[in-house]
UniProtKB/Swiss-Prot annotation:
One of its GO terms (molecular function) is GTP binding. The modification 5-glutamyl glycerylphosphorylethanolamine is found at residue 362. Residues 153-156 are annotated as: G4. Belongs to the TRAFAC class translation factor GTPase superfamily. Classic translation factor GTPase family. EF-Tu/EF-1A subfamily. InterPro entries: EFTu-like_2 (IPR004161), G_TR_CS (IPR031157), GTP-eEF1A_C (IPR054696), P-loop_NTPase (IPR027417), T_Tr_GTP-bd_dom (IPR000795), TRAFAC_GTPase_members (IPR050100), Transl_B-barrel_sf (IPR009000), Transl_elong_EF1A/Init_IF2_C (IPR009001). Residues 194-196 are annotated as: G5. Residues 91-94 are annotated as: G3. The gene is TEF1. It is found in: Cytoplasm. Its main location: cytoplasm. The lineage of its organism: Eukaryota, Discoba, Euglenozoa, Kinetoplastea, Metakinetoplastina. This is Elongation factor 1-alpha.
Length: 449
């Protein structure tokens, strides 16, 4: 075994008919973890329903359907490899909850692949005011996905016919737009592809001799590897907390920042319970330490299942422990809300694993979505498309952090009417004093070591 490959998480964004599923399916199909038998089965099924031209997207649709029905599928199906890296597609926007997933995301995306339909009329629809291309690019950037590869897809369409002119036109327009969003255009690579025919996906296309740049796979290989935040203080939001006979209370969650080791004294907020970590397990194996990205179960002493629950955050008692938030100030972008939002609006916020109503106590100012400049002080109300600075008050105990300190605990989705109506990133938090909480005997003993 040589050096371990770099792991990168990707989100695929773009307008509804840009060909995301076909392009993504193609990569997974050619470089991924789907075995030949499964593909042959998919091909046969696609042919049987007369959708043979749909086989790559079919791969993705099958995976999506299984995912939505709650069948946990082998994550290898969402992976593909290049000589240098292993890529995991963590989400593709066909999902109803795409935006929510991107925020509370199973994991932060390291880069976005923006797929654009080059065909006449389709590109224009995607980039128009109502098109999702703009919305997705802005969302990705706001949520901290700073690297992007842009694919000009459907170069094989008869209105494009692998032409350079159309490609240049699209590059110019998309560059101008993503620059406005905040991306550094110098670092964004554009690749003309056909997700269906396979041009420039993995091998250079002979049909576009005018294009001298990398293929899509090569462009993905040129992305900068992510820096995992293991040097920050520990933050581990709980997904569940179970009682296991003979072992005791086992909280389960994903380490977002920092490191956790057996013997550590940890505090859970907002529950305000402090105890010792006895042991840590991942995939039924004992771990000497858990680092960012690890989904772990850990055994804690003298704590009952009633004390801690999903949405609580675990941190190291001696190193900036998490605390309950009294209130917080956030930059909020309203995506789709039918009416006006004023002070007193109290929707549910999904932030890391917590799902809690928060009141818009005070809309402090309306700001420009891109530059952040103030447009209006204390507006009466805000509506779809607006960005604002809002002071929010959780209606039940909740633990959140400033986005710049602990990104996964500092971004949230605002849910109302069964959809994501807004997204936000937290700029400041007023924390409650964490004294006077429950400290277990085990914690006292371990602290003396």
């Amino acid at each position: 075994m040589g050096k371990e490959k770099v792991h990168m998480n990707l989100v695929v964004v773009g307008h509804v008919d840009a060909g995301k599923s076909t392009a993504t399916g193609h990569l997974i199909y050619k470089c991924g973890g789907i075995d030949k038998r499964t593909i042959e089965k998919f091909e046969k099924e696609a042919a049987d329903i007369g959708k043979a031209s749909f086989k790559y997207a079919w791969v993705l649709d099958k995976l999506k359907a299984e995912r939505e029905r709650g069948i946990t599928i082998d994550i290898a199906l969402w992976k593909f490899e290049s000589p240098k890296s292993v890529f995991t597609i963590i989400d593709a926007p066909g999902h109803r909850d795409f935006i929510k997933n991107m925020i509370t995301g199973t994991s932060q995306a390291d880069a976005a692949i923006l797929i654009i339909a080059s065909a006449q009329g389709e590109f224009e629809a995607g980039i128009s005011k109502d098109g999702q291309t703009r919305e997705h690019a802005l969302l990705a950037f706001t949520l901290g996905v700073k690297q992007m590869v842009v694919c000009c897809n459907k170069m094989d369409d008869k209105t494009v016919n692998y032409g350079q002119e159309r490609y240049d036109e699209i590059v110019k327009e998309v560059s101008a737009y993503i620059k406005k969003v905040g991306y550094n255009v110098e670092k964004v690579r554009f690749v003309p592809i056909s997700g269906w025919q396979g041009d420039n996906m993995i091998e250079k296309s002979e049909k576009m001799p005018w294009y001298k740049g990398p293929t899509l796979l090569e462009a993905l290989d040129m992305l900068e590897p992510p820096v995992r935040p293991s040097d920050k203080p520990l933050r581990l939001p709980l997904q569940t907390c179970t009682k296991i006979g003979g072992i005791g209370t086992v909280p389960v969650g994903r380490v977002e920042t920092g490191v956790m080791k057996p013997g550590d004294v940890v505090t859970f907020a907002p529950a305000n319970v402090t105890t010792e970590v006895k042991s840590i397990e991942m995939h039924h194996e004992q771990l000497a330490e858990a680092t960012p990205g690890d989904n772990v179960g850990f055994n804690v002493k003298n704590v009952s299942v009633k004390d801690i629950r999903r949405g609580n955050v675990c941190g190291n008692t001696k190193n900036d422990p998490p605390k309950e938030a009294a209130d917080f100030t956030a930059q909020v972008i309203i995506l789709n809300h039918p009416g006006q939002i004023g002070n007193g609006y109290a929707p549910v916020l999904d932030c890391h694993t917590s799902h809690i109503a928060c009141k818009f106590a005070e809309i402090e100012s309306k700001i420009d979505r891109r530059s952040g400049k103030e447009l209006e002080k204390a507006p009466k109300s805000i509506k779809s498309g607006d960005a604002a600075i809002v002071r929010m008050v959780p209606q039940k105990p909740m633990c959140v952090e400033v986005f710049n300190d602990y990104a996964p605990l500092g971004r949230f989705a605002v849910r109302d009417m069964r959809q994501t109506v807004a997204v936000g990133i937290i700029k400041a938090v007023t924390k409650k004093d964490g004294s006077g909480g429950k400290v277990t005997k085990a914690a006292v003993k371990a602290s003396k070591k």
